Amino acid sequence: MSSLLSFYRNILNFPLSLLVKSQAIPTDPVSELGLNLEQPIIYVLPYTSQTDLLILQKNCLALNLPDPLVENDIQGQSLPRYVFLDEGHRFFKSKGVKSETESLFYRYLDLHKTDETLDVQLVPVSVLWGRSPGKETAPSLRLLSRFQRIIAMIWFGRDNFVRFSQAVSLCYMVKEYGAEKGIAQKLARVAKIHFAKQRYSAMGPRLPERQAMFDKLIQLPTIVQAIEDEAKTKKIPIPKARQEAEKILDEIAADVSHGTLRMADRVLSWLWNKLYQGINVQNADRVRKLALEGHEIIYVPCHRSHMDYLLLSYILYHQGVVPPHIAAGINLNFWPAGPFFRRGGAFFIRRTFKGNRLYSTVFREYLAELFYRGYSVEYFIEGGRSRTGRLLEPKTGMVSMTLQALQRGLNRPISIVPVYIGYEHVLEVDTYAKELRGAAKEKENAELVLRVIKKLRNLGQGYVNFGKPIQVNSYLNQHFPEWKLPPVENVRPKWLNEAVDAIAKQVMVNINNAAAVNAKNLIGSVLLASRQRALSREQLIEQVESYLQLFQNVSYSSDIILPTESADEMLEHVLALPRSGVMSEKDNFGEMIRLDRESAVLMTYYRNNIQHLFVLPSLVASIVLHNEAASKTLIRETVSHIYPFLKAELFLHFDEKEVLEQVELILTEFIRQQIVKYDGDVLTINRRRLPTLQLHAAGIREILQRYYISLSLLLECPAISRTLLEKESRMIAQRLSILHGINAPEFFDKAIFSTFTASLKAQGYFDLEGHTVIEKVEEVAHILRRLISVEVQLTIQGAMDKVDQIDEKLE
């Protein structure tokens, strides 16, 4: 290296150290990209820039990666550890790959001919200054003078990202394609294409001029026809109907501002640091990969809190991906939040489109336009925030519009990315509990925002886990090949409804497959399983350890996030959380861990986040506990009868065969932990571990009681209507919750009973005429009687006096 260049770099390092704060993507490239530090690495940058090279060096040293300014010594040769792809006088407007770059690639390839153990890793790296894609009417980026570079350093110094890409194995390249000069040229060309794709995935398409977009949409034949129909139906002039359509567009459409996104990034960085001890992000590489491959990405998260809108966009921005346009409820379009959300990417949607064809047409075409222009989109498939902590039944309208846009000729593959979002504390959880007890939902407004801000404090950990993507084109090709048939105008395809329902359910399953187990929801689950919401410290720790071993040894799914802390560390963490409701008390016998009564209701919310993970082990434990001695055949038969209802209610992913395999693994683990004994084909209770078995079994207790209530009503009155069945089931459940101290508000939630009756219908418990199939109902009711305490059965039977009133209503 020349002394002049060395001097220049030393001078340049000073302003960089003051002005630039960069973020590496991914944050741990060695593990996330699978880099082998025992083998040489060569960094490839897209264009010549000493500034970018020095920023890369700083990040490499911080990440324990080889210094790019130190040469690789291979077979007695010293070769540069970095290379610039082209001159870079214009951003992504190349004069061609530098000849010395191709020459260096060839020299590295040639070294592999004589050393089979050598595997040089070629790592593409981009240094991004700012993330604004610009407007559609803006000119292409021009030559940057030194003065302009200084301005960029000042303006974007805190908005700088170093993006490491998947390494290319030169050993593999040589084995597959040889080590000729043509291969070196091909490597350089492929690298150029990769950098162009990477820039697009980080910045996205140009932002539209809002009015120009409106002018285009308002002239679409479908909207023109809807305007004419509106004018005819309401007997108003067409110009007035057109004004209404324009007003709807203005109400709906986002108005993205990169300046707002940058400001939001600063504010949210402060907010997360104030609120949470950490935000745990998993599987973001899935999203980066889809973005690089040019997919239209649709993010579909579960909806726990209004914080979800902000958190997901923030995480995506810091993962080097364009934040999406977000479908937000019209209730959030209030000052000052509405304008801020709109400029941050929110587009607003009314609660219902029913009876408003003009609105539904305009909204559908706006959504399709976002897809066609290449903007990623986010919508909440549950339709609203879950008040119980469970996933709600999916609302399929947005999925339907997505498939319709695809069928109309979207030229890129669509991938739906389910996202699990979880918190150790949800700001609105107190409000949810009140609403479940019958309080009216409070309308969002500025005063409500201020009240929430006052609650800002240590809220523990947050979790964002990107689930397995659903590649819609491939899914439809496999399950609904007729989707490729040309659509008939004004005729809804027969396959569409079934496909929409199937994809919506799969999204929910994949969200649950990506759940995060944390200290609060696990310890809360254990305490809620105890009769008095209290356990000795020793028993609590033993139960938590039992669950951790179960989750590790009998995996629910490969996407689940499990704690890395010990049971003791998890307990200390929860005890330190404000308003957790978990308290430590000491007496002459030792330390007790207790959950106070008021907090018990709130804790059910967090338990419900992960209830689907332990419901199957709980069912197995309950079968052994209540039978005292149970054969594997009995266990399998019982699970086979009850599992379909659990699968529908909790969006479980096992099919009929897989669930029996999972049961076998659970039994093996219970035997290994000595919770049960195994003799021949019979499993019996290990009295020494009886408390542990009881706590495992309690996880499904309330669910089985709900099922038994509805089935008992069906047996008493087979002609009962579905509506009345759900109503009377809820009444009995409310009575049961009072008499037996059940603190879970969802125990008598209308939606859960509705899901159960729908499952009964789907599983053939009603015939084609809607009559109850008594034999099937009696069979499952008989199974449930063996799994429910006599006291609870008597309470339910006592409440069955209401059946006489039902009969009178039916007559």
From Swiss-Prot:
Membrane topology summary: Peripheral membrane protein
Broad EC category: transferase
Motif stretch (HXXXXD motif): 303-308
Cellular compartments annotated: Cell inner membrane
Gene Ontology MF annotations: glycerol-3-phosphate O-acyltransferase activity
Stored InterPro entries: GPAT/DHAPAT, GPAT/DHAPAT_C, GPAT/DHAPAT_LPLAT, GPAT_PlsB, Plipid/glycerol_acylTrfase
Catalysis performed (reactions): sn-glycerol 3-phosphate + an acyl-CoA = a 1-acyl-sn-glycero-3-phosphate + CoA
Gene Ontology terms: cellular component: plasma membrane
Pathway: Phospholipid metabolism; CDP-diacylglycerol biosynthesis; CDP-diacylglycerol from sn-glycerol 3-phosphate: step 1/3
Keyword annotations from UniProtKB, A to Z: Acyltransferase, Cell inner membrane, Cell membrane, Lipid biosynthesis, Lipid metabolism, Membrane, Phospholipid biosynthesis, Phospholipid metabolism, Transferase
Keyword Coiled coil listed: no
Keyword Membrane applies: yes
Coiled-coil zones: none
Protein EC: 2.3.1.15
Cystine pairs: none
GO biological process: CDP-diacylglycerol biosynthetic process; fatty acid metabolic process
Pfam short name (any one): GPAT_C
Family according to the record: Belongs to the GPAT/DAPAT family.
Entry domain remark: The HXXXXD motif is essential for acyltransferase activity and may constitute the binding site for the phosphate moiety of the glycerol-3-phosphate.
Protein name: Glycerol-3-phosphate acyltransferase
Record lineage: Bacteria, Pseudomonadati, Pseudomonadota, Gammaproteobacteria, Pasteurellales
